[in-house]
Amino acid sequence: GYVKEGEDPLKVAAEQLKRDNVDILHTIGGDDTNTMAAQLSNYLKDNNYELTVVGLPKTGDHDVYPLVQTLGAWTAAEQGAIFFENIVNENTTSTRQLIIHEVMGRNCGYLTAQTALEYNNRVKNKVFLPELLIDDDKWGIDAIYIPEIDFDFQLEAKRLKKIMDKKDGVNIFLSEGAGVEAIIREMESNGEEIPRDAFGHVKLDEINPGQWFAKRFSKALNAEKTLVQKSGYFARSAKSNDRDLQLIKNSAQLAVKYALDQESGLVGMDMDENGELLLIDFNRIKGEKPFDHKEKWFVDILRSIGQSY
């Protein structure tokens, strides 16, 4: 409602900032938030209005160049693990149950992978009672699907069918961005319109990758019950853990310093400067940073569950 049809959003925002006599703008968000802030700053400069913009990179997706770590990513992984730690107990309620844990991550599998690592570390501390059918196998992760790794559905279905037959259940960690291209192709072939947001991103909550995969895997695995649970809001609404709080504190203190010195940029851990926390030129900020799926710890997880990598 702030920008009427035909108006330039940058001009509308700039004029409002000028009317309010704002000369320092702190932006907190992901790549879209901070690249738009940079455009706003440049627009105002071109129109003889000095605005200092200092951004903080808050996104659980952890998909921003050139950052080593984004604010909230550690917490999101920890909370996603806690979420699944509760949800997975549903495996006791029926036979041949398929549980899909859908994790945030449009173009980046970092959060799904890190959440899986956190979950595995937590489940190691649990006590199981196989004689009461409370076996650690049924609490284990059987597949992890992320945007960075393509996979053959038929081969995976065959592998998971064997697991379902053996342990009476299958647990999948699915990045919300995994397989999106396949879903889009199917929708377009059916003449369906692809819903997109203001930034041109596909609205993942509307095309619902979790349900799409659930429908196909459920049939292929002869699942008697299928449960799809998204940890996104649970993780996003959680209070920051200690690691994130310390990074937030350090980042905010630097952000205030740079703002008072009238220096614009994004405060973050620069991967090109050995992870040092400093002011990064907005022009270097880009989204869609992929997860390095060749990281040893992640390869070890996939190898342990028999999934191709």
Question: Which ranges hold each PLM region?
Answer:
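Glycine-rich oxoanion-binding loops at beta->alpha junctions
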Residues: 1-23, 32, 60, 71-73, ...
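Accessory alpha-helical/coil subdomains and C-terminal extensions
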Residues: 16, 27-29, 35-50, 70-224
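Acidic/polar active-site rim loop that often engages polyanionic ligands
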Residues: 56-69, 93-96
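Short beta-strand elements at the ligand-binding edges of bilobed clamshell
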Residues: 64-77, 239-245
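Short, ordered loop/turn segments at secondary-structure junctions
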Residues: 30-31, 56-62, 149-150, 176-179, ...
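C-terminal non-catalytic interaction/assembly regions of soluble proteins
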Residues: 179-309
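Short, amphipathic alpha-helical "lid/cap" segments that border enzyme active or binding sites
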Residues: 10, 14, 77, 81, ...
